[in-house]
Each structure stands twice: as structure tokens, then as C-alpha cells.
Amino acid sequence: MRALAKLAPEEGLTLVDRPVPEPGPGEILVRVEAASICGTDLHIWKWDAWARGRIRPPLVTGHEFSGVVEAVGPGVKRPQVGDHVSLESHVVCHACPACRTGNYHVCLNTKILGVDRDGGFAEYVVVPAENAWVNPKDLPFEVAAILEPFGNAVHTVYAGSGVSGKSVLITGAGPIGLMAAMVARASGAGPILVSDPNPYRLAFARPYADRLVNPLEEDLLEVVRRVTGSGVEVLLEFSGNEAAIHQGLMALIPGGEARILGIPSDPIRFDLAGELVMRGITAFGIAGRRLWQTWMQGTALVYSGRVDLSPLITHRLPLSRYREAFGLLASGQAVKVILDPKA
């Protein structure tokens, strides 16, 4: 089979030929039909400081994908051969204090597909059976491939007291920020403001936002106060940008909620008393997806048609054109890029 792998501690990935793996006890073999490139995959491609500290080549990359169950290992009762599945990328231990208290999304021993073990940029991949989410067979594979990152957006929007009837600021209009705008709109939030300095991506938020803000052209805090009269009740932070985090926190009304998924590339400084404590701000750190609550919430939105993820899929390319695909995403002129492992 063909697979896209990190073979050496250096920039880039390589298209390789490997034997089709066999599922062991509790595992399934998935025939991958669609895979999506994530920002994490770009870090692995670039071989930046994070990748150098985490990735151990050789490794087949990719953690956003969908496919069909081709075979099952001993002891597997579900899913069954022929099922259409999306994959939860976090493989958890079930034994640590986080898992034993139901917080599987912050398992202390998490292994991530395409990061810590072989992932889905391949024609076939073996995964734990418990990591498969079975979809209706009429759900397009390319949409099924991005249910995993969609779960990050759902987790962020529904954390804390939710967003229904509340004013919301979304900082960062990357794929997950755009997905969050969709979820917030479908969940009764309003007004919704979306801020991002990339005009291409910001435009994708137009159907779901009451106000778009390019912080390079407008004063974000001034716009927030003009639209809301005082500030927003909820901040959904996806950028990881230090300035955006500071502005987002100060855009909150006293007593507001900050839900932060974006990860800064370096440690940041902020005024704990002035930005958080004395204003009574409740902050939530968002990691992954709650298993399996987030999947149930997210698929309910997608299966019912309340959220349509397909407009975010801007490019579809064969796996053989992976260099072009990664270049598109790195350019900022794409949202979700889908790879077809069979082509």
C-alpha cells in the first residue's frame, strides 16, 4: 500500500510503499477513503521545535480521516466489516486518574494517531476498534474525515454554560474557528463576531457571523463594544496569538467565559489580576473531544443538517500530489484540504 511518512528527522514527508497491516486483538483494519491535512501535520512537515520534541520517525502521519472497515481482529464485535467510520485520534489508556474519572480527553497516557503511532495518510491503517465512530453510509467520506476536528469546535462551543442566547467573539478563523461559528449559529448564539487577519479565511465566516473583524484594519475592542454595547459574554479562542488572546479576554464582560483551544507557539505573559481575576472571568482550557459526548453532540448537528461542513472543504487532491496539498494549506489560501489515498 502507499503511505505518506516521516522517514527521517528533517523537513518534508515521503510517499512510500508498505505492506498492508493486519489487525490484532481489539483492532480493526480501515480502508482509508478520505484524509484531511491538519495544522499538526504542517508542524510535522516543517520539522519545527514541537515536531522535533514529539515525533519519532519512521511514522505514517495523518489523524483526520475516514473509511470503511476492511477487517476486524480477534474479539471485535463492533464495528463490523463494511461499516463506514470516522476515527477518534486519541488512543487512551483507561487506567490513569483522568480516564477513571471519565475525562478520557485528557488521558495522561494519550497516544495520537499520526503523531505517536501510524495514522491515516495511507491506503490502510490499523486502529483500536473502540476509536471508530460508525457513520450513516450516505455521509460523504470527505465530511466524515473532518468530524474529528469538528469535535474540537463542538467541545469549545458547548463547554461551560454553552452559547445559546449569548454574545460570542471567535478569535481565529482557521478551520476549527469556522466550525465553531457554524455550531454557535446553529445553537442560538448572537451576536457572533469573528476576528482574523486573513481575509480569505475570514470570508468563510460570513454566513455564520453578525460581524467580521480584521484586527489589522479595525480596533477589535472598539468593534465589540459598538456591536454589543459593553462586551461579549463568551470568548472562543482558536488563534493561539498572544495579541488576540489579550484582546479577547478584554472583550469579555465581567463574569464572562473564555474557552481557549488555540495554543501559543511560545509562553505568553498576561495580567492575571487585571484580565481574569478581578473581572470574574471563568477560563476553560479545551483539549480534544470529550469521549464520547462530543461525538454525539457533533454528529447530531451534522446528521440532522443543522451544520453543513462541506463549504469548508476547499481543495481535493490525490495523495500523489501531497506536496501541492501541503503548500496550499501553508499558504493560508485553503481551509480544509482532502487527500484521496487511492489516487
Swiss-Prot record:
The protein's UniProt keywords, in alphabetical order, are: Cytoplasm, Metal-binding, NAD, Oxidoreductase, Zinc
Q: What CDD domains would the database entry show?
A: TDH
Q: In which pathway does it act?
A: Amino-acid degradation; L-threonine degradation via oxydo-reductase pathway; glycine from L-threonine: step 1/2
Which subcellular locations apply to this protein? Cytoplasm
The alphabetized list of GO BP terms reads:
L-threonine catabolic process to glycine
Q: Which GO terms describe its cellular component?
A: cytoplasm
- Which leading EC class covers this enzyme? oxidoreductase
**Chief place of localization:** cytoplasm
Q: In this UniProt entry, which residues are annotated as the site Important for catalytic activity for the proton relay mechanism but does not participate directly in the coordination of zinc atom?
A: 148
The cofactor binding remark recorded in the entry reads:
Binds 2 Zn(2+) ions per subunit.
Q: Which residues form the active site?
A: 40 (charge relay system), 43 (charge relay system)
Does the UniProt entry include the keyword NAD?
yes
The free-text function statement in the UniProt record for this protein reads: Catalyzes the NAD(+)-dependent oxidation of L-threonine to 2-amino-3-ketobutyrate.
| Listed HAMAP family | Thr_dehydrog
Q: What's this protein's name?
A: L-threonine 3-dehydrogenase
